[in-house]
Amino acid sequence: MISVSKLSKQYGNQVVLKDVDLEFAKGQSVALIGPNGSGKTTLIKSILGLVVPDEGKIEVQGANIRTSPNYRRDIGYMPQLSRFPEQMQVRQLFSLIDDLRKGEDGIEKDLSLYEDFQIDRIARKALGALSGGMKQQVSAALAFYYNPEIIILDEPTAGLDPVSNEILKAKINRQISLGRLVVVTSHILSDLDEICNHVVYLMEGKIYMNASIDQIASETGEQKLNKMIVKLIENKNSDE
């Protein structure tokens, strides 16, 4: 569903991505992880067309993103920080999205998170008056709103209360069962244990690890993602 080939990006003298090759398939839920500054955000923004790479090619569902801008209709995106117009009401934001997508035929909206988070009760509130957790709920509901085939979630559980956290994780797992592609970044690796079946670990702009959770568990003998990562890094360092 997403193919990344020889992707490189540099800001001044800082190399952010270097010859990145990746393939993301239907039914995968990918944990995109790595230290701060490893290139995760730049990779996501490159896929979304928000950053123009210096070299390389990205295809989404077979379409080159440089020549097929409509590919983004198939992607639901939840940013790490949502910058909503502060004076706009929640209901107006959803209406605005509806207006922007008007004329697209055959799309059935997914209101499950809207309903599960009970967003109706805050629909007339100004976005600027919402708590951080409420903004995360709105952002998550928007990411799934138009039933996308690909969902990209950047730190999705940050700021969510425990109940909302479980609701969102259950939603992600339902999407995986439907064959959707989910890409998740998070520093809370314990959350990723429950929703991801594949790991891409970036370090200094390069792919350090690209494997299924089952494969990593078999290699390390560990069942928790954070322990798997530590064991693999220790093993690699001891081999060098």
Task: Specify the residue positions occupied by each region the protein language model found.
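Conserved ABC ATPase "signature" region
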Residues: 95, 105-122
